[in-house]
Amino acid sequence: MPQVGVIVGSASDHPVMEDTMKTLEGLGIEAELVTASAHRNPERVREWVNGAAERGVEVIIAAAGGAAALPGVVASYTTMPVIGVPLASSELGGVDALHSIVQMPPGVPVACVAVGAWGARNAALL
């Protein structure tokens, strides 16, 4: 059973998040990776998050670029820890995603790591 759930909004995010998956594997931590967009597949995101605890997931790592809604949407559906990984997917180099993730409103907590591959690796280490 996976202890960590990793969710990304697009298949194009997979290469960066391979650092997360490899780091978790190296630590002997089982993880699952799913692709579901907060903008294009919000219902799929909700269903995945709501079933996470039943699958054994204890923490969720959510990666997103641009408006980076995914980590906050995930956190709105669960009380388990959510770590947001901002990705550099726009002309702003990930600063937009970073600001979106660190500015969650009260009651929707998301921990935030560095932009890109360094953050992806650190999310696994947390």
Feature locations, PLM:
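Short, glycine-/small-residue-rich phosphate/pyrophosphate-handling segment
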Residues: S90-L126
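Glycine-rich phosphate/diphosphate-binding loop of Rossmann-like nucleotide-binding domains
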Residues: P2-R40
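Proline-centered loop/turn at the N-terminus of a beta-strand
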Residues: Q3, P81-P86, V108-P109
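Glycine-rich phosphate-binding loop
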Residues: W48-S90
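N-terminal beta-loop-helix "entrance" segment that forms/cooperates
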Residues: E32-R55
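Solvent-exposed alpha-helices and their adjacent loops that cap or buttress functional pockets
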Residues: M1, A52-E54, A75-Y77, I101-P106, ...
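Short beta->alpha connector loops at strand-helix junctions that form conserved
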Residues: V8, T35, A64, V85-A88, ...
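Short glycine/serine/threonine-rich phosphate/pyrophosphate-binding segments
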Residues: D13-E18, N41-V45, A64-V73, L92-V95, ...
